[in-house]
Design a protein with these regions (language model features):
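Flexible "cap/lid" loop of the alpha/beta hydrolase fold
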Residues: 1-5
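Conserved alpha/beta-hydrolase catalytic His-Asp/Glu region
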Residues: 6-70
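Generic structural signal for small/hydrophobic residues in well-ordered secondary structure
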Residues: 18, 38, 51, 77-80, ...
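A general structural signal for short secondary-structure boundary/capping elements
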Residues: 21-26, 53, 82-89, 122-128
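Residues at alpha-helix caps and immediate loop-helix transition turns in enzyme cores, especially N-
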Residues: 34, 63-64, 88-90, 116
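Nucleotide-sugar-dependent glycosyltransferase donor-binding/catalytic pocket residues
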Residues: 60, 84, 110-113
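Conserved loop-alpha-helix segment in the C-terminal half of the alpha/beta-hydrolase fold
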Residues: 70-108
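Catalytic active-site module of serine/aspartate enzymes centered on a nucleophile-bearing elbow/loop
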Residues: 98-129
Length: 129
């Protein structure tokens, strides 16, 4: 039953809807190649269900507050401007460590590196120069 449920959850139609509704600012920019790759990676390897199970069971939501407070290196957050609660997320990180710097990429959502790679590259280069 577990494999059946996993196959439903990682179906191409579910991945496509997630990209259109949650990952991309403009749903018409979703390239079918991205859907193919995500679908393929959900079914390849020795344990493709591991990441899905970890996300569903909230194992990927570790509290890193104490670690962030102690970091004395540069930390830079880059997010999509239309990502839900991005300003709040950045604020929470900077509350832990005021040295954290951030930028948002306009007209992008969850995957700014795919939606606008030129702007992401420009922003990253600006930070490291």
């Amino acid at each position: 039953i577990g494999t059946l449920l996993y196959n439903f959850a990682s179906a191409r139609s579910i991945i496509s809807r997630t990209f259109s509704e949650s990952y991309f600012y403009n749903p018409y920019d979703v390239n079918p190649h991205y859907i193919d790759k995500y679908h393929e990676s959900a079914h390849l390897g020795d344990s493709p269900k591991s990441v899905y199970a970890s996300v569903q069971c909230n194992y990927t939501k570790c509290n890193i507050t104490k670690t962030l407070e102690k970091i004395d290196n540069s930390i830079y957050i880059l997010g999509g401007e239309a990502e839900q609660d991005i300003d709040l997320i950045i604020k929470e990180y900077t509350k832990c460590n005021p040295a954290i710097e951030s930028s948002t990429i306009p007209n992008t959502k969850h995957l700014p590196q795919i939606e606008n790679p030129e702007e992401v590259s420009s922003t990253v280069q600006m930070f490291f120069n």
